[in-house]
Amino acid sequence: MRTVLFGAAVLVALLAAAPSPRPGAVVHIRDDAFVPASIAVRVGETITFVNDDDDAHTATADDASWDSEGLNQGQKWTHAFAKAGKIAYHCTVHPMMRATIVVRSAS
């Protein structure tokens, strides 16, 4: 019984210590554009991409490190950013749709 309780306590402690993404920003997809076209977040924060357009779109990093896959009208997709840097991204369905994310250090 003590072993089970100890194991459960360790599991709870590990889950509590695990970092969880912090809410960040929202990028809307409308009129074949990302709005805003440039946005900044901090390491550990998220961006939620919301498709407000009639057409399906993606939000895809130029370096292919992340991809929302197809988002239909009204669908959302959230991504957490783990390292600082400048990220260019685009829509694979409409390559002329381009935007930039600046991820700043958490401090």
Give the ranges of each region predicted by the language model:
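Extracytoplasmic copper-binding redox domains, predominantly the cupredoxin/blue-copper superfamily
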Residues: 2-107
